[in-house]
Swiss-Prot record:
GO terms for molecular function: rRNA (cytosine-N4-)-methyltransferase activity. It catalyses: cytidine(1402) in 16S rRNA + S-adenosyl-L-methionine = N(4)-methylcytidine(1402) in 16S rRNA + S-adenosyl-L-homocysteine + H(+). One of its GO terms (cellular component) is cytoplasm. The keyword Cytoplasm applies. HAMAP family: 16SrRNA_methyltr_H (MF_01007). It holds the Pfam family Methyltransf_5. InterPro entries: RsmH (IPR002903), SAM-dep_MeTrfase_MraW_recog (IPR023397), SAM-dependent_MTases_sf (IPR029063). This is Ribosomal RNA small subunit methyltransferase H. Its EC number is 2.1.1.199. Belongs to the methyltransferase superfamily. RsmH family. It is found in: Cytoplasm. Keywords: Cytoplasm, Methyltransferase, rRNA processing, S-adenosyl-L-methionine, Transferase. NCBIfam families: 16S rRNA (cytosine(1402)-N(4))-methyltransferase RsmH. It comes from Neisseria meningitidis serogroup C (strain 053442).
Length: 328
Protein backbone atom coordinates (compact mmCIF):
# COMPACT_ATOMS: atom_id res chain seq x y z
CA UNK A 1 0.00 0.00 0.00
CA UNK A 2 1.42 3.37 -1.00
CA UNK A 3 1.72 6.30 1.38
CA UNK A 4 -1.30 8.00 -0.12
CA UNK A 5 -3.38 4.87 0.20
CA UNK A 6 -2.65 4.56 3.91
CA UNK A 7 -4.60 7.72 4.70
CA UNK A 8 -8.04 7.12 6.09
CA UNK A 9 -10.82 8.36 3.85
CA UNK A 10 -14.45 8.50 4.94
CA UNK A 11 -16.94 9.02 2.13
CA UNK A 12 -19.37 11.83 2.96
CA UNK A 13 -23.13 11.30 2.63
CA UNK A 14 -22.43 7.86 1.20
CA UNK A 15 -25.86 6.26 1.39
CA UNK A 16 -27.79 9.49 0.88
CA UNK A 17 -25.98 10.34 -2.36
CA UNK A 18 -26.27 6.86 -3.87
CA UNK A 19 -29.90 6.53 -2.73
CA UNK A 20 -30.58 9.82 -4.53
CA UNK A 21 -29.48 8.25 -7.83
CA UNK A 22 -32.23 5.60 -7.54
CA UNK A 23 -29.85 3.10 -9.16
CA UNK A 24 -31.35 0.72 -11.73
CA UNK A 25 -29.67 -2.67 -12.13
CA UNK A 26 -29.14 -2.21 -15.88
CA UNK A 27 -28.38 1.50 -15.74
CA UNK A 28 -25.37 3.52 -16.82
CA UNK A 29 -23.95 5.81 -14.13
CA UNK A 30 -21.09 8.27 -13.76
CA UNK A 31 -19.04 8.99 -10.65
CA UNK A 32 -17.39 12.25 -11.65
CA UNK A 33 -15.09 12.31 -8.61
CA UNK A 34 -13.87 8.77 -7.89
CA UNK A 35 -11.49 9.64 -5.04
CA UNK A 36 -10.97 6.33 -3.28
CA UNK A 37 -14.16 4.81 -4.66
CA UNK A 38 -16.58 4.94 -1.74
CA UNK A 39 -19.58 6.09 -3.76
CA UNK A 40 -18.53 3.99 -6.76
CA UNK A 41 -18.40 0.74 -4.83
CA UNK A 42 -21.87 1.31 -3.39
CA UNK A 43 -23.24 2.09 -6.85
CA UNK A 44 -21.65 -1.12 -8.18
CA UNK A 45 -23.25 -3.13 -5.38
CA UNK A 46 -26.64 -2.01 -6.70
CA UNK A 47 -25.91 -2.58 -10.38
CA UNK A 48 -26.56 -5.87 -12.14
CA UNK A 49 -24.29 -7.55 -14.67
CA UNK A 50 -25.69 -5.37 -17.47
CA UNK A 51 -25.02 -2.13 -15.60
CA UNK A 52 -22.11 0.21 -16.26
CA UNK A 53 -20.19 2.74 -14.18
CA UNK A 54 -17.84 5.37 -15.62
CA UNK A 55 -15.50 7.05 -13.14
CA UNK A 56 -13.50 10.28 -13.53
CA UNK A 57 -10.61 11.68 -11.52
CA UNK A 58 -7.66 14.01 -12.11
CA UNK A 59 -5.53 12.57 -9.32
CA UNK A 60 -3.04 9.90 -10.50
CA UNK A 61 -3.25 8.14 -7.12
CA UNK A 62 -7.05 7.96 -7.35
CA UNK A 63 -6.79 6.70 -10.93
CA UNK A 64 -4.47 3.90 -9.80
CA UNK A 65 -7.17 2.75 -7.36
CA UNK A 66 -9.86 3.08 -10.04
CA UNK A 67 -7.88 1.07 -12.57
CA UNK A 68 -7.32 -1.68 -10.03
CA UNK A 69 -11.09 -1.78 -9.47
CA UNK A 70 -11.71 -1.85 -13.24
CA UNK A 71 -9.39 -4.84 -13.66
CA UNK A 72 -11.55 -6.84 -11.28
CA UNK A 73 -14.93 -5.48 -12.43
CA UNK A 74 -15.57 -5.18 -16.17
CA UNK A 75 -18.57 -2.90 -15.55
CA UNK A 76 -16.17 -0.07 -14.68
CA UNK A 77 -14.70 2.39 -17.17
CA UNK A 78 -11.99 4.84 -16.06
CA UNK A 79 -11.32 8.38 -17.31
CA UNK A 80 -8.13 10.08 -16.13
CA UNK A 81 -9.13 13.72 -16.37
CA UNK A 82 -11.43 16.40 -15.08
CA UNK A 83 -15.16 15.95 -15.33
CA UNK A 84 -15.45 19.02 -17.57
CA UNK A 85 -14.63 16.57 -20.40
CA UNK A 86 -17.88 14.72 -19.57
CA UNK A 87 -19.40 14.60 -23.06
CA UNK A 88 -16.11 14.03 -24.89
CA UNK A 89 -15.21 11.15 -22.58
CA UNK A 90 -18.61 9.49 -22.92
CA UNK A 91 -18.43 9.84 -26.70
CA UNK A 92 -15.03 8.16 -26.65
CA UNK A 93 -16.47 5.26 -24.67
CA UNK A 94 -19.43 4.90 -27.02
CA UNK A 95 -21.92 5.93 -24.35
CA UNK A 96 -24.97 8.04 -25.15
CA UNK A 97 -27.47 8.83 -22.43
CA UNK A 98 -26.86 7.97 -18.78
CA UNK A 99 -29.17 7.16 -15.88
CA UNK A 100 -27.38 9.20 -13.27
CA UNK A 101 -24.28 11.19 -12.38
CA UNK A 102 -22.74 11.90 -8.97
CA UNK A 103 -20.17 14.57 -8.08
CA UNK A 104 -18.46 14.84 -4.69
CA UNK A 105 -16.75 18.19 -5.12
CA UNK A 106 -13.61 19.64 -3.63
CA UNK A 107 -10.56 18.00 -2.15
CA UNK A 108 -10.41 14.51 -0.62
CA UNK A 109 -9.01 13.51 2.75
CA UNK A 110 -6.08 11.57 1.22
CA UNK A 111 -5.08 14.68 -0.72
CA UNK A 112 -5.25 16.86 2.40
CA UNK A 113 -3.47 14.35 4.62
CA UNK A 114 -0.64 13.58 2.19
CA UNK A 115 1.75 16.35 3.17
CA UNK A 116 3.76 15.99 -0.04
CA UNK A 117 0.84 17.25 -2.14
CA UNK A 118 1.05 20.78 -0.75
CA UNK A 119 -2.66 21.22 -0.07
CA UNK A 120 -2.39 21.69 3.68
CA UNK A 121 -0.65 24.26 5.87
CA UNK A 122 -0.35 21.56 8.56
CA UNK A 123 2.73 20.18 6.80
CA UNK A 124 5.88 21.86 5.52
CA UNK A 125 5.94 20.67 1.92
CA UNK A 126 6.47 21.88 -1.64
CA UNK A 127 3.67 24.29 -2.56
CA UNK A 128 1.99 22.26 -5.31
CA UNK A 129 -1.81 21.99 -4.81
CA UNK A 130 -2.48 20.36 -8.20
CA UNK A 131 -5.01 17.54 -8.18
CA UNK A 132 -3.29 16.20 -11.30
CA UNK A 133 0.40 16.42 -10.47
CA UNK A 134 1.37 15.62 -14.06
CA UNK A 135 -0.33 18.63 -15.66
CA UNK A 136 -0.57 22.37 -15.26
CA UNK A 137 1.10 25.02 -13.14
CA UNK A 138 1.76 24.42 -9.45
CA UNK A 139 0.71 26.93 -6.80
CA UNK A 140 4.34 27.94 -6.25
CA UNK A 141 4.85 28.57 -9.97
CA UNK A 142 1.71 30.71 -10.17
CA UNK A 143 2.55 32.70 -7.02
CA UNK A 144 5.98 33.45 -8.49
CA UNK A 145 4.54 35.22 -11.55
CA UNK A 146 1.04 36.45 -10.64
CA UNK A 147 0.48 40.18 -10.38
CA UNK A 148 -0.47 41.69 -7.04
CA UNK A 149 -3.94 42.44 -8.43
CA UNK A 150 -4.44 38.85 -9.61
CA UNK A 151 -3.33 37.50 -6.23
CA UNK A 152 -5.75 39.85 -4.49
CA UNK A 153 -8.67 38.91 -6.73
CA UNK A 154 -8.12 35.16 -6.42
CA UNK A 155 -7.78 35.26 -2.63
CA UNK A 156 -10.78 37.57 -2.29
CA UNK A 157 -13.12 35.88 -4.78
CA UNK A 158 -12.29 32.22 -4.15
CA UNK A 159 -11.40 32.44 -0.47
CA UNK A 160 -13.75 35.25 0.59
CA UNK A 161 -10.78 36.57 2.57
CA UNK A 162 -11.19 40.10 4.01
CA UNK A 163 -7.44 40.69 4.13
CA UNK A 164 -6.77 39.63 0.54
CA UNK A 165 -5.15 42.91 -0.49
CA UNK A 166 -2.71 42.88 2.44
CA UNK A 167 -1.85 39.22 1.80
CA UNK A 168 -1.25 39.85 -1.90
CA UNK A 169 0.99 42.82 -1.17
CA UNK A 170 3.01 40.78 1.33
CA UNK A 171 3.41 37.89 -1.13
CA UNK A 172 4.81 40.21 -3.79
CA UNK A 173 7.21 41.80 -1.29
CA UNK A 174 8.43 38.45 0.04
CA UNK A 175 8.94 36.81 -3.35
CA UNK A 176 11.25 39.68 -4.34
CA UNK A 177 13.59 38.46 -1.60
CA UNK A 178 13.17 34.68 -1.88
CA UNK A 179 10.82 32.18 -3.55
CA UNK A 180 7.57 31.24 -1.80
CA UNK A 181 7.82 27.56 -2.61
CA UNK A 182 6.63 25.75 0.51
CA UNK A 183 3.35 25.58 2.38
CA UNK A 184 4.99 26.87 5.56
CA UNK A 185 6.34 30.00 3.86
CA UNK A 186 2.92 30.87 2.45
CA UNK A 187 1.12 30.12 5.72
CA UNK A 188 3.52 32.38 7.65
CA UNK A 189 2.96 35.27 5.25
CA UNK A 190 -0.81 34.90 5.58
CA UNK A 191 -0.69 34.65 9.38
CA UNK A 192 1.28 37.89 9.57
CA UNK A 193 -1.35 39.75 7.54
CA UNK A 194 -4.67 38.43 8.88
CA UNK A 195 -5.44 40.84 11.70
CA UNK A 196 -8.50 39.09 13.13
CA UNK A 197 -8.89 35.33 13.34
CA UNK A 198 -12.03 33.24 13.09
CA UNK A 199 -12.56 30.95 16.04
CA UNK A 200 -11.38 27.43 15.35
CA UNK A 201 -9.93 28.32 11.93
CA UNK A 202 -6.29 28.75 10.97
CA UNK A 203 -5.66 32.16 9.37
CA UNK A 204 -4.27 30.44 6.26
CA UNK A 205 -7.44 28.42 5.59
CA UNK A 206 -9.15 30.84 3.22
CA UNK A 207 -6.02 31.70 1.24
CA UNK A 208 -5.06 28.05 0.75
CA UNK A 209 -8.63 27.25 -0.34
CA UNK A 210 -8.62 30.14 -2.80
CA UNK A 211 -5.33 29.23 -4.46
CA UNK A 212 -6.27 25.55 -4.66
CA UNK A 213 -9.61 26.36 -6.31
CA UNK A 214 -7.90 28.66 -8.81
CA UNK A 215 -5.03 26.30 -9.67
CA UNK A 216 -7.44 23.42 -10.34
CA UNK A 217 -10.15 25.55 -12.03
CA UNK A 218 -12.64 23.94 -9.68
CA UNK A 219 -15.51 26.39 -10.04
CA UNK A 220 -15.14 26.62 -13.82
CA UNK A 221 -15.31 22.83 -14.07
CA UNK A 222 -18.47 22.67 -11.96
CA UNK A 223 -20.13 25.30 -14.12
CA UNK A 224 -19.02 23.48 -17.27
CA UNK A 225 -20.17 19.97 -16.35
CA UNK A 226 -23.71 20.71 -15.15
CA UNK A 227 -25.22 21.55 -18.58
CA UNK A 228 -23.37 18.61 -20.11
CA UNK A 229 -24.92 16.23 -17.58
CA UNK A 230 -28.37 17.72 -18.18
CA UNK A 231 -27.97 17.04 -21.91
CA UNK A 232 -26.91 13.43 -21.31
CA UNK A 233 -29.40 12.35 -18.66
CA UNK A 234 -32.22 10.07 -19.70
CA UNK A 235 -35.73 11.09 -18.70
CA UNK A 236 -35.96 10.22 -15.01
CA UNK A 237 -32.17 10.24 -14.66
CA UNK A 238 -30.68 11.89 -11.59
CA UNK A 239 -27.93 14.44 -10.97
CA UNK A 240 -26.54 14.39 -7.41
CA UNK A 241 -23.91 16.91 -6.27
CA UNK A 242 -22.18 17.19 -2.89
CA UNK A 243 -20.63 20.62 -2.32
CA UNK A 244 -18.43 21.67 0.59
CA UNK A 245 -18.38 25.44 0.43
CA UNK A 246 -20.73 28.21 -0.55
CA UNK A 247 -19.07 29.03 -3.87
CA UNK A 248 -19.58 25.52 -5.26
CA UNK A 249 -23.02 25.15 -3.75
CA UNK A 250 -24.18 28.48 -5.17
CA UNK A 251 -23.31 27.35 -8.72
CA UNK A 252 -25.21 24.08 -8.29
CA UNK A 253 -28.20 25.69 -6.59
CA UNK A 254 -28.55 28.42 -9.22
CA UNK A 255 -28.19 25.97 -12.11
CA UNK A 256 -30.86 23.61 -10.78
CA UNK A 257 -33.16 26.51 -9.97
CA UNK A 258 -32.75 28.02 -13.44
CA UNK A 259 -33.61 24.81 -15.28
CA UNK A 260 -36.37 23.61 -12.97
CA UNK A 261 -38.64 26.61 -13.52
CA UNK A 262 -39.75 28.94 -16.29
CA UNK A 263 -38.38 32.43 -16.60
CA UNK A 264 -41.08 34.99 -15.68
CA UNK A 265 -43.23 35.88 -18.68
CA UNK A 266 -43.78 39.54 -19.55
CA UNK A 267 -47.33 40.81 -19.06
CA UNK A 268 -47.80 41.20 -22.79
CA UNK A 269 -46.79 37.58 -23.60
CA UNK A 270 -49.25 35.78 -25.88
CA UNK A 271 -48.82 32.48 -24.01
CA UNK A 272 -49.47 31.44 -20.45
CA UNK A 273 -46.95 29.61 -18.29
CA UNK A 274 -49.31 26.62 -18.17
CA UNK A 275 -48.99 26.31 -21.95
CA UNK A 276 -45.19 26.11 -21.91
CA UNK A 277 -43.36 22.75 -22.01
CA UNK A 278 -42.12 21.58 -18.63
CA UNK A 279 -38.61 22.64 -17.62
CA UNK A 280 -35.83 20.09 -18.31
CA UNK A 281 -35.10 19.52 -14.61
CA UNK A 282 -37.06 19.17 -11.42
CA UNK A 283 -35.71 19.40 -7.90
CA UNK A 284 -35.72 15.96 -6.27
CA UNK A 285 -36.23 16.62 -2.57
CA UNK A 286 -34.69 19.17 -0.28
CA UNK A 287 -30.98 19.79 0.13
CA UNK A 288 -29.47 17.32 2.60
CA UNK A 289 -26.72 17.83 5.16
CA UNK A 290 -24.88 15.24 7.27
CA UNK A 291 -26.45 14.32 10.57
CA UNK A 292 -24.82 14.75 13.97
CA UNK A 293 -23.53 11.18 14.04
CA UNK A 294 -21.76 11.52 10.68
CA UNK A 295 -20.22 14.85 11.67
CA UNK A 296 -19.00 13.35 14.96
CA UNK A 297 -17.35 10.49 13.06
CA UNK A 298 -16.00 12.76 10.30
CA UNK A 299 -15.74 16.46 11.22
CA UNK A 300 -14.80 17.31 7.62
CA UNK A 301 -18.38 16.43 6.62
CA UNK A 302 -19.75 19.40 8.56
CA UNK A 303 -20.07 21.76 5.60
CA UNK A 304 -21.33 19.23 3.03
CA UNK A 305 -24.60 19.86 1.16
CA UNK A 306 -26.22 17.35 -1.21
CA UNK A 307 -28.51 18.65 -3.97
CA UNK A 308 -30.40 16.39 -6.37
CA UNK A 309 -32.20 17.10 -9.63
CA UNK A 310 -34.11 14.82 -11.99
CA UNK A 311 -34.31 15.06 -15.77
CA UNK A 312 -37.83 15.51 -17.09
CA UNK A 313 -39.21 15.09 -20.61
CA UNK A 314 -38.96 18.84 -21.10
CA UNK A 315 -36.78 20.24 -23.91
CA UNK A 316 -33.37 21.71 -23.17
CA UNK A 317 -32.95 25.35 -24.24
CA UNK A 318 -30.72 25.75 -27.29
CA UNK A 319 -28.11 27.84 -25.45
CA UNK A 320 -27.47 24.86 -23.15
CA UNK A 321 -26.72 22.52 -26.06
CA UNK A 322 -23.38 24.06 -26.96
CA UNK A 323 -20.54 22.09 -28.46
CA UNK A 324 -18.53 20.25 -25.86
CA UNK A 325 -15.38 22.19 -26.82
CA UNK A 326 -17.01 25.37 -25.53
CA UNK A 327 -17.16 23.87 -22.02
CA UNK A 328 -13.50 22.90 -21.79
Amino acid sequence: MSGAESYRHITVLLNEAVDALAVREDGVYVDGTFGRGGHSRLILSRLGDAGRLIVFDKDPQAIAVAEELARSDKRVGVVHGGFASFQTALDGLGIGKVDGALFDLGISSPQIDDGSRGFSFRFDAPLDMRMDTMRGMSAAEWIAVASEQDLHEVIKNYGEERFSRQIARAIVAQRAESPIDTTRKLAQIVAQNVRTRERGQDPATRTFQAIRIFINRELEEVGAVLPQVMCRLKEGGRLAVIAFHSLEDRIVKQFVKKYSQHAPLPRWAAVREADLPEPPLKIAGRALKPGEAEIAANPRARSAVLRVAERTAGPIPEQSQRKTSEWQ
